[in-house]
């Protein structure tokens, strides 16, 4: 039986006049801290950019968060560390757990003294791309200084003209004692509670006044800051050590509505691979704009090839591109065969909702709710750039898709957020997002970034946002003051000191937390940001080609005397230049799942005949064979050559050796024969 409550609604307030159903809360996630700190939490370390944007005084460390007696304890200390007077801790569920709508709560007891700033809050999942406050922020509770009879709930967002807007209200609550702080949130309204008693609400229905940010997924953050713009800079040193106790954090969703509980088995981020072509669903030109069409493309690992499947009701999903935040959309609400699939800001129409139907072997049909047709690759194309459209369901393989789970990690570092530097300068940038860029016009200059986390071992794509008036610049990337050199990259001419482009290379890093360094090998150039993205394992991304593994040539973990350059081959990215005899590349932990024959293909280009490569395992201890490289008519005219080799079952480091130069290589594919 549906229970209706009558109530009075103001834009901001507590009194209400509407009718709504009583939520039936179902627990979907929690951390009770009975078995330590869950792996769903990620620690943020350091002092952030400009003191986390607030000129805060503390340095965040992992060591300042521990479990004591079944409770998470964040301890702020008066201790000198890396140039800061205070340490504390900050945890978030970003990259691991995020939710859209529901009830989020924590049972907490917090300290109260001059200079403290305690927060339990949430931020939009897209914060790395749109920046604050456009990503939206809801503070379940924040408390500052010695006002121990008050806690505050706040909401921050960006208005349509880009201005920062916020509302807040205080609750008469003594935070030193344990209380349950909750927020209930749906597509229409956000409500704040202490111990089940509501004290604040804000209407967000229809994205009014720019509040559409609160209709996206969010992640949760816990932290205790010391000092800053809001609490001030007068800190009571006698109050340390100070402890913030969290008994639990819980997330509920409403089981009495159609969204989002139900069959949510596909909820999450995926690479989407076509069964017929074995290429991947991709947003054309990696666009963030409404109206950009979908296409198929070679695997890149980028976020424009990752899609969030969010269950709405009865096997109906909203499908959102991770990079742009836009939803898959049937062009102009079309119902006919041949209508293109594009991306568009989500509005909840049936042309933006899809049923997902399993056909076995890990493949699915994706069916627009408004037309009942299949999302397919047009004309049975196997070419990169093939169009994505809707068509009648004839069980065509071009309309079947493998959903390959993405567990990507991405971190954006503002170039000016270094903790140490030499011979660099800051200046205002005209790049998107504004702020500052770093001027690198002295050879030997460098910047160091503290406590950069690489959560798992493997390949990472490192992107740099750069500008230069002339060619010839070069940077190098290292870890821990140069003890581990990851690679070098040429900085091209972009046509001006404020004409920006993004360059990248792939590096191999063991899991761990490092100080990351950028060194100016050759000046002059500017840099605005660095982005680190975990590249998912290729072995999990080539399931559409049975017993096949594709290796991007630039994904080596070690090398000698080769260089990277932009490629004109299908799929873009980088190729490796092999123009020195004796040069080599090594690829880590390549699996040969059974003994026998394997076809090894190489995507190569050369201006002249006479090139030769050799293939070996484990630093040359097993030589598998050699292969001549023909003239292809140019260093960006690509062809595929191959040979058959015999390999015993096992996992090896695979090497490619330049017997005779010069040639380029884009990828290697290994297929069990």
Swiss-Prot record:
Function in brief: Component of the heterodimer clotting factor G which may play a role in defense mechanisms against fungi. Initiates a (1->3)-beta-glucan-sensing clotting pathway whereby the alpha subunit binds to glucans containing (1->3)-beta linkages, which are components of the fungal cell wall, and the beta subunit catalyzes the activation of proclotting enzyme.
GO cellular component assignments: serine-type endopeptidase complex
Listed PANTHER family: GLYCOSIDE HYDROLASE FAMILY 16 PROTEIN, GLYCOSYL HYDROLASE-RELATED
Tissue: Expressed in hemocytes (at protein level).
Domain Ricin B-type lectin: 266-404
Annotated ranges, domain CBM6: 411-533, 549-671
Annotated protein name in UniProt: Clotting factor G alpha subunit
This protein's UniProt keywords: Glycoprotein, Glycosidase, Hemolymph clotting, Hydrolase, Lectin, Repeat, Signal
EC nos: 3.2.1.-
Signal peptide start-end: 1-19
């Amino acid at each position: 039986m549906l229970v209706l409550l009558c109530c009075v609604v103001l834009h901001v307030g507590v009194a209400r006049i509407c009718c709504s159903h009583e939520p039936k809360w179902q627990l979907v996630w929690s951390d009770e801290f009975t078995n330590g700190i869950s792996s769903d939490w990620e620690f943020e370390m350091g002092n952030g950019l400009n003191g986390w944007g607030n000129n805060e005084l503390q340095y965040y460390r992992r060591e300042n968060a521990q479990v004591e007696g079944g409770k998470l304890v964040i301890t702020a200390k008066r201790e000198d560390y890396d140039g800061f007077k205070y340490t504390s801790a900050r945890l978030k569920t970003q990259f691991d757990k995020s939710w859209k709508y529901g009830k989020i709560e924590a049972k907490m007891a917090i300290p109260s003294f001059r200079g403290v700033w305690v927060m339990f809050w949430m931020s939009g999942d897209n914060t790395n791309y749109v920046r604050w406050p456009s990503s939206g922020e809801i503070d379940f509770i924040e408390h500052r200084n010695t006002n121990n009879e008050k806690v505050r709930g706040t909401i921050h967002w960006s208005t349509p003209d880009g201005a920062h807007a916020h509302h807040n209200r205080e609750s008469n609550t003594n935070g030193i004692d344990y209380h349950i702080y909750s927020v209930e949130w749906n597509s229409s309204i956000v409500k704040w509670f202490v111990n089940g008693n509501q004290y604040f609400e804000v209407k967000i229905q229809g994205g009014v006044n720019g509040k559409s940010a609160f209709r996206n997924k969010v992640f949760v953050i816990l932290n205790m800051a010391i000092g800053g713009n809001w609490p001030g800079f007068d800190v009571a040193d006698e109050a340390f050590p100070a402890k913030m106790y969290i008994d639990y954090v819980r997330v509920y969703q409403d089981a009495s509505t159609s969204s989002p509980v139900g069959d949510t088995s596909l909820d999450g981020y995926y690479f989407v691979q076509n069964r017929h072509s074995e290429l991947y669903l991709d947003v054309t030109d990696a666009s963030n704009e409404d109206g950009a069409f979908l296409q198929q493309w070679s695997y890149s690992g980028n976020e424009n090839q990752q899609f969030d499947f969010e269950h709405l009701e009865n096997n109906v999903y909203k499908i959102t591109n991770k990079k742009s935040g836009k939803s898959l959309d049937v062009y102009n609400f079309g119902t006919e065969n041949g209508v293109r699939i594009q991306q568009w800001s989500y509005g909840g129409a049936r042309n933006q909702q899809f049923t997902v139907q399993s056909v076995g072997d890990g493949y699915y049909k994706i069916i627009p709710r408004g037309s009942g047709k299949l999302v397919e690759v047009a004309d049975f194309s196997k070419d990169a750039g093939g169009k994505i459209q809707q068509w009648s369901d004839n069980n065509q393989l071009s309309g079947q898709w493998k959903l390959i789970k993405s567990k990507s990690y991405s971190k954006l570092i503002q170039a000016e957020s270094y903790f140490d530097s030499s011979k660099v300068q800051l200046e205002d940038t005209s790049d998107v997002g504004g702020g500052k860029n770093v001027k690198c016009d002295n050879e030997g200059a460098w910047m160091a970034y503290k406590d950069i986390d690489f959560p798992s071992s493997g390949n990472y794509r490192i992107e740099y946002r750069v500008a230069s008036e002339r060619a010839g610049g070069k940077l190098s990337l290292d870890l821990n003051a140069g003890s581990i050199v990851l690679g070098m990259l040429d900085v091209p001419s972009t046509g001006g000191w404020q004409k920006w482009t993004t360059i990248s290379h792939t590096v191999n890093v063991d899991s761990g937390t490092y100080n990351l360094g950028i060194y100016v090998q050759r000046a002059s150039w500017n840099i605005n940001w660095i982005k680190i993205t975990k590249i998912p394992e290729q072995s999990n991304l080539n399931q559409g080609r049975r017993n096949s593994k594709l290796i991007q040539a630039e994904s080596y973990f070690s090398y000698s005397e080769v260089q990277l350059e932009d490629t004109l081959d299908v799929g873009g990215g980088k190729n490796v230049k092999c123009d020195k005899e004796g040069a080599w590349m090594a690829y880590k932990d390549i699996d040969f799942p059974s003994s026998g024959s394997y076809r090894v293909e190489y995507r190569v280009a050369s201006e002249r005949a006479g090139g030769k490569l050799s293939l070996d395992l484990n630093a040359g201890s097993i030589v598998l064979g050699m292969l001549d490289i023909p003239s292809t008519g140019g260093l960006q005219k690509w062809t595929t050559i191959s040979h058959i080799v015999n390999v015993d079952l096992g996992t090896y480091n695979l090497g490619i050796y330049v017997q005779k130069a010069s040639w380029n290589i884009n990828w290697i594919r290994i297929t069990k024969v």
